[in-house]
Each structure stands twice: as structure tokens, then as C-alpha cells.
Amino acid sequence: YSGVFNGQGHRITGLNFSAATTELFGLLNVRGVIKNLQLIDVNLYGSSGSAAGIVEQNEGQIIACSVTGKISAYGRTCGIAYSNYGDITACWFNGTLKKDESGAIVRYNYAYVTSCYWGGNAEQGVFSNLGGEVDGGAKVDGATVKWQTAVDGMNTALTGNDYQWTLGTGGLPVLKRNNNEP
């Protein structure tokens, strides 16, 4: 995908599918942008390969996206992207991943992950950082780091974005239009 997919704060709820490898987008090209999108209560299964919530390979930008639910696979799992050669900014994951070698945000990072947070069973946001940069972000454990901490950290990284995170009534971040933007 090489266009701009602006979810405009919308939610896709109950996405449930199984394929050899499973993700919403296969490849996000260097010119591609996916932003302001929430996937809620997904159930994804990669029957012979890997599974990721948003994209298999990111070469573009993923901004202000989130995934909740269960992601499992014959191979490895990730909440947002399997491999990152671009930018992932102010995203979060909360759910269940296959425990073996999983990254809540990304499995292999070769570029930039900024202010991304996660909850659920994953211990690491980035499973393997291969020359990339990880700036900010943490596991939300409810004691040291709470979801409000995540909201504040993500919004700091979203300067100029048309949506910001706010703490929803269910205790998890939700997207809200930034009234300061046109």
C-alpha cells in the first residue's frame, strides 16, 4: 500500500480471520501512511506463517494506531508490525500474543519506534532492535506505568496530528479529533 489511509479515529471491531500470514495490510510502501485507526477485539491467526495487527512490513509511517485482542500464529506474532523499516509513532497494543519471540509493537525494528506502549502478555515492545531507534514508550503494568501515562507520552509525539489520544471510559486510550487542527 502506498497511499494515505486516515482512519479518522474510526474503529474496526471484531476483525476475525485466518490465512497463511495475517495482517490488515501486507506491505506499507515508503510513501504509505496509516494513521488514526483502532482495531478492537481482533482475533487473527497466521496458519503457516506470522501474524501482525496492522502490517507485515512497514516502510512508511504508522501513526496513532492501536490494536486490542488476540493474535496467534504458527510462526511469530506482533501487535502492530512484523518488521519496521519506517516510522511507528504513538501506537499501542493491548491483548494476547503467542509468547514465543513476540513483540507487542514490532518484532524486527530497523528504523524508528517512538512513544509506543503496550499491555497484555507481551514482555517486550520491540522483540529485536536491529540498528533502529526506540524512543519512549513502555509496558503498561498498572502500577509504575498506567494508561494515562501512555496517553500523555503518545500525545507528546503527535504534534501536528489531526487526532490525539484520550483515556476512554473503558480505561484504554481512544482517538479524539484535535480541535486545534483544520
Can you name each region flagged by the protein language model?
Residues Y1-P182:
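Predominantly extracellular beta-rich ligand-binding scaffolds that present long acidic/polar faces
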